[in-house]
Structure formats: structure tokens, C-alpha cells
Amino acid sequence: MSKSPDPTRDELFAEPLKQPELFTFSEAVAGVFPDMINRSVPGYATVVAMTGVLAAQHARPDSTIYDLGCSWGASLLSAARKIDHPSCQLIGIDNSEAMLKRARLNFQEQLGDQRVVLRASDIMDIQLENASVVILNYTLQFVPIMHRETLLRRIRSAMLPGDVLILSEKLTLPDPQLNDYLIELHHNFKRQQGYSDLEIAQKRQALEDVLIPETRHQHVERLHQVGFSRCDIWFQCLNFASLIAIA
């Protein structure tokens, strides 16, 4: 007797598609998102775990911790578990109601924390206030490049000196040959996670013109331009990195 397919396993690109649609955070994607991101982003679990550690280091009493593009809420949950200040409020923002539906269940089942608020909104439309910690894990890369500085400037304006932005992104490298080498290493990583060449190719096509990576230099330069005093990479695995920016 054959096993029933696992509905939480990412097989969205397993069958040939005439023309893969542009990638969106749809109901189908939301349903398999934890499996998708863990099998697609090397070092993801480490980034999530350390997000909690970094957030706890910088969270101020009576301040707000924001997770912009929170999806299922893994990073915000990590922060909530590590932050000791009961007066801190934690706010998760996502424009996908399908993601937020699962995030609400996630928090109810694992935390039941009344400090956590989840909101459906475009992160470009929100007003940030008294933000001691802002989490942008694998979110900025989906924001059009022309709007990224505006968002980061708004984040910095909501902070006091010493507050922190945690920014995780897929990177591109200025050396084309090294960039291609890391892309192929990433594809090999995904093969080791059980993805087929067809799945890798079709998802890459779906993400083209949707996920736009930048170089480390571009990120650091922009962060300085909007007013962060210090910033650099604290973790990297292949072409995925996490930066910390201190206000």
C-alpha cells in the first residue's frame, strides 16, 4: 500500500509546467512554506535561532519588536521565546493572509503570548514606532529596488541609537564566475534536500524578476546612507547571508 502524499512537503514545481507563473506567497505556497524554506535556504534554521538571540540582546523595555514579512512567524516566535521584557510588544506584518492564518495557529499552539500581534499589510504602508528590533529575514529581496531605501529609512527613523535591524537576504557576488559557482553550489544543496533538476529550474524561472538579490556592498552602503552607524554580515552560508545593522 503506497503512502499518501505529505501535504506539507513542497512539491509545487515537481510536475512540468507549460509556463511557471511568477512566484507569489499564495495559499499553495503558504501550505508548504516551512518545508520549502528549510530545503531551499542553507543556514535558515541557524538564522531563525540566532534572530531570537540578537533580538533579546537589543530589545528595550516598553519597545516594539517588528517582523516585516513574517510568513509563518518563525523569526518572531524565536524572538518572543528569548525576550524577557514582558512590556515589549511583538508585531508581525505580512501581506499574505494565507501566511498569517498559519502564523496565528503557530503562535497559539506554541506560545499563546498576548504580546504578539499579527497584521495583514504591505510593509511599505505601515507606520513603525519605538522599534528596538526590526527583523527583515528574506523579505527585502522581494521589495522593488527603487523602494528599498525608503523602507529602510523609515525603519531607521523609528529607532533610537543602539537599536538593531536584522536583515537576511540572498546575495549576488560582483565576481560573475564566483557568483555562478555559488549558484551551482546552491542548486547542489537543493538536490541534496530532495529537489529534482526540474523543480529547481521551474522555481528559478518563477522567481526571476520577483526576487532581486544585491551584493553585500550594496546592502551595507544603503544601510549607512539611511543612518545606521555600523553594519556587516554576521552569518553567511553560500549565497545567503544575514546582516546586523546598529542604529
Mark where each language-model region is.
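A conserved beta-strand element that flanks and buttresses the S-adenosyl-L-methionine
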Residues: 135
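N-terminal auxiliary segments of SAM/dcSAM-dependent transferases
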Residues: 1-22
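A short glycine-rich, Lys/Arg-flanked "PGG" loop and its adjoining helix->strand segment in the class I
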Residues: 149-161
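Class I SAM-dependent methyltransferase SAM/SAH-binding core
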Residues: 66, 73-124
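Conserved class I S-adenosyl-L-methionine
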Residues: 166-192
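Short alpha-helix
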Residues: 209-226
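Conserved alpha-helix/loop element of class I SAM-dependent methyltransferases that forms part
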Residues: 43-61
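Class I SAM-dependent methyltransferase Rossmann-like catalytic core
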Residues: 18-23, 29-47
